[in-house]
Structures are given as structure tokens and as C-alpha cells.
């Protein structure tokens, strides 16, 4: 079977020659003139360890054919990475729309999640496609060399922003549990946006040295024709500052938050049981108390019980939110830890470790880390009803929640029913007043209150002039 290349020329009809792949530029060139080569010549692969790879075999393979064969071998990898890119961009756009349009989701934690979705979406737009392109070109940089430092800068920026957002969310939840009054007072939308700006500022500061030094010295961002960080000091410092230190803070504050929630729930349950015992305790039987005292006691009892129910509800909501955030934290740590651990191992055991194995692991682990940006919207969909309903409506191009017809029927019918019942009751009262005759027992028939009975008795005494005691 012949492979046809450019200009419809088959491999068997082209003479042999010796091709050289330049390791610095990634370009192909001929070392021999095709006129001097015999069609029966054949030679073998020879590899120069530093800069070039000499390629020759039976049947001359021009550069375009080599590229086509190389791309065909990478089709499956490109397909998988393309699926990850599409899921990342589409899912995070849905998260941004949900927080922007749904009033139920407009709080401090969801603002952080929206900013996190923006970072993940930009990672899918600007970083992942270029990384997929390097896979197709055998992990060699196919773009101008000046763009390498910019691409690494964006990669580090958005990855650092993701871990910083999760760290800030963990700290914010812990402060909200420990000091809810202070947190609710200073947790306005403006304060939340200021915190988000601080997170992005820290992320920019951590990643800014890459373009500053990389644009001046290509050796810091190029290694054997591949675009990657070649400065060991920056790899070590950047890994700890951008990942391990925020990770430690995030894990500690998250477990402290869970512990505080359990303590609050225990105290709330004990407080509710104490209130119930005090409310049911009385020296006198309930039948011996007047209706006025019973009414006052019930009024004093209800606010406390309502407050207890509201506290339990808020604790339950916090526990559900911490569960969702805990899943997000766990997935982020599991997916990014292999890359950063391997990255540090590549620096520490540079001489003892196999460089090719470490490089292959890093190429796989970085895409596992990218996958965490696509997983977050799926977590929100599975564990949050508001996100789930919003996503389903947005996919159907319905950007506003439709009100249920039952609610409209209730609003329209209840006032009419209330009006009819009030008119009927008024008519019955009027008929009863017309049929009633004044007797001596008019004073004893009044049961609506002491003041009203006294006024009715006074009117009857003035009109009838009977000697009836109304006390």
C-alpha cells in the first residue's frame, strides 16, 4: 500500500535521500542532492544526541509526509484532549452564567466559584489548545519562540489562580463559622470582589517572573526544543508558593471548618432540648391558667423555637456547602498533586532519575491537572439543585426561570374566596342582629373582652333604665 503525499507523489517513485531534523528549529532539510542518490540506496536511523536526528530509509519521505504520519499517530491523543477542552470551556461558561443570572446563587462563596470558573475557562481557551498542538508536533514548540514564555506564564497564572481561589474559599468559610456576625457585616458584594481581586493579584505576582526572565533568556523556557521551565530554582520555589503552601492552608482550614460545624450542631441540639424542657415546665396546671396568660406564654415560646429551627437550618446548609466544596478540594488535590510531586522529583533526582520517564509522566500528569478544570461544573451539577436546574434551562436557551401555573392560580383565587367568605359572615351577623331581641342577658352574652362588655352594658342601662348589674 502506497502513501500519497504532496503533489500526488508516491513514496516508491521518489529516490532515497538522507533527511535531517534540526532539533533547534524543528525544520527538515536535505543533506544530499537527490540527483546524486541512487534509487536503490538505503540507510538506517542514526541519532545525534544533542541537536539532530538523521533519517533515511527505503523510499524518500519528504517533510510533509513525515508530518502527516506523525499527526496520524497522535489522532487519539488529540481527540481526548479536544474533548477535555470542550468540556472545560462549555461547563465553566454555564457556571458563570448561573452565578450572574440566578439570584439564589449570588453570595460570596459563589462569587469565588464564578471567578474560579473564569480562570478555568481562560485555561481552556488560551493554554489547552496550544498544549494539544505541542502533542501533535511531538512535544516540540511549533510557534515563535517569544510566545513560549507567554504561554508558560498563562499556564502558571491560571493554575495558580485555581488553587488560590480554593484556598480563599476555605478561609472565608472558616471565618464565617467562627465569627458569623462579623462575617455577615463585612461580607458584602464589594468585599467579595475585593477578595477576588486580591487572589488574582497574588496569582499574577507568582507567575510574573516567567515572562520577565523568559523573554530575555530562551534557555530558561526551552529545553531540547520543548517549551517548558528549565530553571530549577523557579520550579522548586514556584511549586511550593503556588501549590503546596496554599494546599496546606486549604486542608487545615477545611478540617477546622468541619470540626466547628460539628460543635455548633451539638450545641444547637442541646440548646433546643433545654428550651423544650423549660417551655413545658410550670408550677400550675395549664387548665388553671387564664387564656391571657396562656397566650402570652405561647408568644414568648415561639420566637425561641423559630430561632432554633433557623439555626439548625443554617448549620445544615453550611454542611451541604462544605460537602460540595470538599469534593472540589479533593478532586483538585488528587489531580494536581502527581504533577507537582513529579515536577519536584525531576529537579531533586535529576542525575539518578530517568529523564525520559520523568518527562513522559509530566506530559500525562499535566493533562490530568487540566481535567480538574472540566470536573468542577460536573460536581456542581450533581450536588447542587440550583446549579442543576439552571444548567438544564441554559442548555434549552431558557435564561429565566418560568413560574409555575399553580402559583398564579393561588394568587388570583385566594383573594376572591376570602372576599366571598367575609361577605357571607357579615350577612350572617347582620341577620342575627335583626332577629335578636334585647333582654336582661345582653351583658352576659358579650365574650370578646372586658372593655367591650362594659361599654355594651353601659349603653343598655342608659336606654332601658333597668337596674342590672353588669359586673
Curated annotation (Swiss-Prot):
Keywords: Behavior, Cell membrane, Cell projection, Cytoplasmic vesicle, Disulfide bond, G-protein coupled receptor, Glycoprotein, Membrane, Phosphoprotein, Receptor, Synapse, Transducer, Transmembrane, Transmembrane helix
Membrane topology note: Multi-pass membrane protein
Superkingdom field: Eukaryota
Residue numbers bearing the Phosphoserine modification: 280
Residues noted as binding serotonin in the record, renumbered to the chain: 155, 343
Activity regulation, per record: G-protein coupled receptor activity is regulated by lipids: oleamide increases HTR2A-mediated activity.
GO molecular function, one term: identical protein binding
Record: glycosylation sites: 8, 38, 44, 51, 54
Chain ranges on the Extracellular side, renumbered to this chain: 1-80, 138-146, 216-232, 349-356
Ranges spanned by the short sequence motif NPxxY motif, renumbered to the chain: 376-380
Xref: InterPro entries: 5HT2A_rcpt, 5HT_rcpt, GPCR_Rhodpsn, GPCR_Rhodpsn_7TM
Record-stated family: Belongs to the G-protein coupled receptor 1 family.
Function of the molecule: G-protein coupled receptor for 5-hydroxytryptamine (serotonin). Also functions as a receptor for various drugs and psychoactive substances, including mescaline, psilocybin, 1-(2,5-dimethoxy-4-iodophenyl)-2-aminopropane (DOI) and lysergic acid diethylamide (LSD). Ligand binding causes a conformation change that triggers signaling via guanine nucleotide-binding proteins (G proteins) and modulates the activity of downstream effectors.
Subunit structure and binding partners: Interacts (via C-terminus) with MPDZ and PATJ. May interact (via C-terminus) with MPP3, PRDX6, DLG4, DLG1, CASK, APBA1 and MAGI2. Interacts with GRM2 and DRD2; this may affect signaling.
Protein name from the UniProt record: 5-hydroxytryptamine receptor 2A
Lineage: Eukaryota, Metazoa, Chordata, Craniata, Vertebrata
